[in-house]
């Protein structure tokens, strides 16, 4: 169902109201940089599959992409080795556990289950093409820039803040490596993964990146193909299964769209063939998802009738 400009503008107002009225949560405090971001920031954006952009609030304030980056590194690797190889090497199942848990690794002989949790994302980073760590990182950055339709940059402040506190991810990488499921030097994989989480984006960027998936892999602003049409569906499936971690059930009920969150406060949701919704607000719930952003995206999706599990209109009996 295609949404008119007026409908999207009205939905944004409803989303803004829902986001601003949502309370609770706190900034991620285990990464020093994230703890220092003003908690009252809130932005919301929609970009359609034909390139129309709508936004409100702090939609052009930059923040750390964090785990939302996993989607785009997955796209890069899927283009390189194909979805079947990704499933074999990284996995394609929900864990039902926190995003940084090692329990799933122990239960599955050191193999990750999903490219959208930390273990699988580190394994995915180890599969990025390139002869050196810098070459692999540059490939990731160029991929992110292509999805956003503009030049993005690494925040040295975010990267340093994370590199000095990522001991848990280093342990995960060594567990993967010991099981033969980290496909490069494990510390190089963690370094690349940490860098990919440290680029700066806006809610408008995230909506554009999501709209690229909604448009079958072609950026609707630049016209550049970023991922083959056949690889879009597997990416959206991964987002559906693991994009919001242990809050996935609530998300499926209230939003009903493929989505991905990050502890920087961003959330991106994709309506295949139509548009993408993105929101940003730093305070997080216990699962690591932005309280205000979740409420805002849910309100926009509901207003536009874009919950994929809801039947609209008359149904024949």
Swiss-Prot record:
E.C. number: 3.5.1.2
Gene: glsA
Protein name: Glutaminase
Pfam families membership: Glutaminase
Family: Belongs to the glutaminase family.
Top-level class of the enzyme under EC nomenclature: hydrolase
Residue ranges the record marks as coiled coil: none
Positions annotated to bind substrate: 67, 118, 162, 169, 193, 245, 263
Any one GO molecular function term: glutaminase activity
Database matches in NCBIfam families: Gln_ase, PRK12356.1
Gene3D superfamilies: DD-peptidase/beta-lactamase superfamily
Catalysed reactions listed for this entry: L-glutamine + H2O = L-glutamate + NH4(+)
Superkingdom of the source species: Bacteria
The keyword Hydrolase is assigned to this record: yes
BP term (GO), one: glutamate biosynthetic process
UniProt subunit comment: Homotetramer.
PANTHER family: GLUTAMINASE (PTHR12544), GLUTAMINASE 1 (PTHR12544:SF48)
Disulfide bonds: none
Assigned keywords, A-Z: Hydrolase
């Amino acid at each position: 169902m295609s949404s008119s400009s007026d409908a999207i503008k009205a939905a944004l107002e409803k989303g803004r109201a829902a986001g601003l009225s949502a309370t609770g949560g706190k900034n991620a405090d285990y990464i020093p940089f994230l703890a220092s971001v003003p908690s009252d920031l809130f932005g919301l954006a929609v970009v359609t599959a034909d390139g129309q952009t709508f936004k409100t609030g702090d939609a052009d304030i930059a923040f750390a992409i964090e785990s939302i980056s996993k989607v785009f590194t997955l796209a890069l690797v899927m283009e390189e080795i194909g979805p079947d190889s990704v499933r074999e090497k990284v996995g394609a199942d929900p864990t039902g556990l926190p995003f940084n848990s090692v329990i799933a690794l122990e239960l599955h002989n050191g193999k990750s289950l999903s490219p959208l949790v930390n273990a699988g994302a580190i394994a995915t980073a180890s599969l990025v093409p390139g002869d050196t760590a810098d070459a692999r990182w540059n490939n990731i950055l160029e991929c992110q820039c292509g999805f956003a339709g503009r030049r993005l940059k690494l925040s040295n402040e975010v990267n340093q803040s994370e590199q000095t506190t990522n001991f848990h991810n280093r342990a995960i990488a060594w567990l993967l490596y010991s099981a033969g499921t980290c496909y490069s030097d494990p510390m190089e994989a963690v370094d690349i993964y940490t860098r990919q989480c440290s680029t700066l984006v806006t809610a408008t960027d995230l909506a554009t990146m999501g709209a690229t998936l909604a448009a079958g892999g072609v950026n609707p602003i630049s016209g550049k193909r970023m991922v083959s049409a056949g690889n879009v569906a597997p990416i959206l499936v991964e987002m559906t299964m693991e994009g919001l971690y242990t809050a996935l059930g609530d998300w499926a009920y209230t939003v009903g769209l493929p989505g991905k969150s990050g502890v920087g406060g961003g959330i991106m949701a994709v309506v295949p063939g139509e548009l993408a919704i993105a929101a940003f607000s730093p305070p997080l719930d216990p699962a690591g998802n932005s309280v205000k952003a979740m409420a805002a995206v849910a309100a926009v999706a509901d207003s536009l009738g874009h919950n994929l599990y809801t039947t609209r209109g008359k149904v024949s009996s």
